[in-house]
């Protein structure tokens, strides 16, 4: 299988396509990072104060996590922010848990934005507007706003480049046969989603790639796409782990919760993969959803149901994590 695939990509045109994919991924990751960092600079102190004041219970923490992640477009950044607040002694572990849960739901906003038809066609216009605000105005807040807009445009431009490259790849028989294996080997899809997301440290990037692959027909079956999405949610926990290294015990426990929450949720959904698939298909047929929107629905269902499932067992999970990571 792999020998045929690597023989296929030796072709010069395929290498050029792959270089385009890598470039598109780089632009996407830079855009999402620029947007998030600029937003944190623009409203960072206010955002931290709001989070500190409003996360007095888990459910409020979930809402804050959804809101913040929906704005900065990165669940990893929101999770890392909550862990940094723990390390600074400004937040307790139970408060952070709500934010982590909400961040998982909030990150699905990006998938829904990608599902809008032809949104990538406006990416260069958005980039141009952002550049004008950066280079032609001296006001710091205007410059930061320009960076946010520029990052937003780069995000969609990078995804458009990746989508174009993937659609060309999908036309090749060898690549299509390789991707078809995900339908019959869900564990391979789970592993692929985990590894890719851990490497790029962006679940939104992996989700966007899955959307493009499913839309182009490279992943011909929804059943082949779902395990990759589930693996995506495992791989994204790497950021929380890295953020907690060298931190206080509470920060390490919050990172452990993120791993426990996402990994156990993925395992449960792998067990109920067929009912999960049937529910997504039902929504697809009910709303006449496009392939990209279908993946966005699947992403939302997993993260919402996973949160609703575990929110009632937070005390028990905290007790277990304290046993695994003892200390004060």
Descriptions of predicted regions:
Residues 6-19, 112-122, 176-183, 223-226, ...:
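Interfacial loop-to-helix junctions that mark the boundaries of transmembrane helices
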Residues 30, 34-42, 46, 50, ...:
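Membrane-spanning helices that line or support transport/gating and their immediate boundary helices
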Residues 71-72, 78-104, 112-122, 132-134, ...:
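Membrane-interfacial helix-loop connectors
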Residues 20-33, 65-69, 127-137, 151-161, ...:
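Hydrophobic core segments of alpha-helical transmembrane domains in multi-pass membrane transport
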Residues 27, 40, 76-80, 107-114, ...:
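Alpha-helical transmembrane segments and their lipid-water interface positions
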Residues 159, 166-182, 246-328:
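Transmembrane alpha-helical segments and their short flanking loops
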Residues 45, 49, 53, 57, ...:
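Alpha-helical transmembrane segments of multi-pass membrane proteins, especially transporters
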Residues 3-58, 149-195, 213:
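Helix-loop-helix hairpins and the membrane-proximal interhelical loops
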């Amino acid at each position: 299988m792999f020998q045929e695939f690597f023989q296929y990509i030796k072709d010069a045109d395929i290498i050029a396509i792959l270089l385009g994919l890598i470039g598109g991924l780089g632009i996407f990751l830079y855009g999402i990072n620029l947007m998030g960092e600029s937003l944190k600079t623009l409203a960072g102190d206010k955002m931290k104060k709001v989070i500190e004041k409003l996360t007095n219970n888990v459910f409020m923490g979930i809402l804050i996590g959804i809101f913040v992640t929906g704005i900065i477009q990165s669940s990893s950044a929101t999770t890392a922010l909550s862990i940094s607040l723990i390390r600074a002694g400004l937040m307790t572990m139970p408060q952070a848990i709500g934010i982590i849960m909400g961040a998982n739901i909030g990150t699905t906003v990006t998938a829904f934005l990608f599902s809008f038809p032809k949104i990538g066609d406006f990416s260069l216009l958005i980039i141009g507007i952002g550049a004008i605000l950066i280079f032609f105005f001296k006001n710091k807040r205007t410059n930061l706003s320009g960076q946010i807009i520029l990052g937003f445009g780069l995000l969609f431009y990078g995804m458009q480049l990746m989508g174009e490259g993937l659609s060309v790849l999908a036309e090749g028989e060898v690549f299509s046969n390789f991707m078809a294996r995900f339908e019959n080997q869900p564990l391979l899809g789970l592993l692929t989603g985990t590894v890719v997301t851990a490497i790029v440290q962006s679940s939104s990037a992996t989700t966007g790639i899955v959307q493009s692959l499913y839309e182009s027909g490279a992943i011909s079956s929804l059943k082949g796409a779902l395990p990759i999405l589930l693996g995506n949610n495992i791989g994204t926990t790497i950021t929380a782990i890295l953020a907690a290294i060298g931190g206080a015990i509470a920060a390490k426990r919050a990172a452990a919760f993120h791993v426990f929450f996402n990994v156990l949720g993925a395992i449960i959904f792998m067990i109920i993969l067929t009912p999960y698939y049937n529910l997504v298909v039902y929504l697809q047929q009910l709303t006449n959803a496009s392939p990209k929107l279908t993946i966005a629905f699947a992403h939302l269902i997993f993260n919402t149901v996973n949160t609703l499932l575990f929110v009632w067992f937070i005390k028990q999970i905290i007790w277990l994590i304290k046993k695994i990571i003892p200390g004060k």
